[in-house]
Amino acid sequence: LKIPLYIVLSVKFLNFFSENLAVKYAAFLFSIPIKFRRPDRENEYFLNSIHKKIYIPEVDKKIMTYELEASGPKVLLVHGWSGRGTQMHALAKECHKEGMNVFSFDLPAHGQSSSNTTLIPEVVKCVRSLYQKIGPFDYAIGHSIGGICIMNSLRFGDKYKKMVTISSPHVNVDMFKDFIFKICLLYTSDAADDQA
């Protein structure tokens, strides 16, 4: 993903006058996911699922939820950064075919959920809140950041019979280093490695 030049220049400008301001601005930028239009391939899942907005008091935000009802085990699907709950439509369809009650949601600041900003700790709180309100879930599948958030929910007592993570980074630092390098707060990839 290429960062627009005006953002790079604004970070450099702030950094010239105040490193602290530049870092705060970079942290704010990092919290804003890119929103993409839902592609046609996700429409079947969107149309066949039950949609409900649920308020998550722990983060003071509303999230859009999607459910394919069934009488079998409950499975939670958690998408990655800049994605949508409907993005996991193929997994949802297969799980539902096997008789599972499938549940997914748009992370805060994603899809049809409220807000323009979010960070991993907020998403973990959403996963935990859904586990308590709608769960417990028998299974959980997370893609990228979604996998990180499911793994973190385990630390706080959520329990799943099985959990699957797909392309989840094992170290969050790499994502931050890459972003900081792209906005030119670090000027070489070697410098980014030295900061780890």
PLM features per residue range, with description:
Residues 141-142, 146:
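Gly/Ala-rich beta-loop-alpha elbow adjacent to hydrolase catalytic centers
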Residues 92-112:
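Conserved alpha/beta-hydrolase
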Residues 117-134:
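Alpha/beta-hydrolase active-site loop
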Residues 147-157:
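Short glycine-enriched nucleophile-adjacent loop
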Residues 187-192:
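Conserved small/polar residues in nucleotide/adenosyl-binding loops
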Residues 2-54:
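An N-terminal hydrophobic leader/cap segment in hydrolases
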Residues 165-173:
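Active-site nucleophile loop of the alpha/beta-hydrolase fold
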Residues 81-92:
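The serine-hydrolase catalytic nucleophile loop
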